[in-house]
Amino acid sequence: MRTIQHLVIPGGAIYGLSYYGSLKYLCQNNAFQMHNIKTIHSTSVGSIISTILALKFEWSEMDNYFINRPWHEVFKFSLCSIVKCFKNNGFFDISTIKDIFLPLFSAKDIPIDITMKEFYEATGVELHFFTIDVSNFSLVDINYESYPEWTVVESVYASSCAPVLFQPFKKNGSWYTDGGILANCPIKQLCESKINPKLDEIISITTEDRVGDTNKTYDKYNLLQYVFDLLSKIVNKIQPTYTPDKEFSRYEVIISQSLIPVYDVFSIVNSPQQRKILIDHGAELSRDCCSKILERNIDIIDSIV
């Protein structure tokens, strides 16, 4: 019987919590087990989620971390941060990613400056983070083989530094920005890589149409919501509107982003209740995918018997 060995986790800002909720539901209902996972391909917030999953905490511990941590102390919005945004091309810098990971890394006795190669050796999970080299607007796959000496924090930040919200990542004379513009869901990159996975070894999470309702009103948008809605429309012109791609993925969870505006960071960092709603949203949308995987396993067992 084939087991799920590869996960694909996309970008999607606050909906990273829904991706986490989806994978928690699938794992707890025996669709896959983390100890069988060999690779995780991810972009933007998906890179944050994949790093945390690779640490293999108990689900109850991760629930407590995501829901009850005082996130407003990590993402601090103030007049000072607004001024810095104009000066430094973004509200937050790499120190925010360090703050996200520090308590988790410390709990596992992992140094915050651990390299990609060291992290692979410690966890056994091959992480692939996708970012964009701004100079030539090319997609870059950061992994332990291609960038072994980059730290995990640097690699995740390069993949996650969405324009305006985060400052671009600068290293070795190059600037990097959020990989979601060119590969928001890097399932194609996984399937066309040397890994050459079987279709029934992959669980892919993706999002439905990123543009959303064309009749929406902008009257109540804040700056971040306006900028990222505009970016979503640009991305949609670069990448075709999403349709399920059975050529690349047999087991897929499609996360609707209609529950809360995708870049409503302000309300999410201040509300444990809203964070739990997003996690439960992901779990609810995973039921069909879970049933497909379990039915497949039953059919295989029946055929063997």
Residue ranges and their predicted role:
Residues 1-43, 51-305:
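Patatin-like phospholipase
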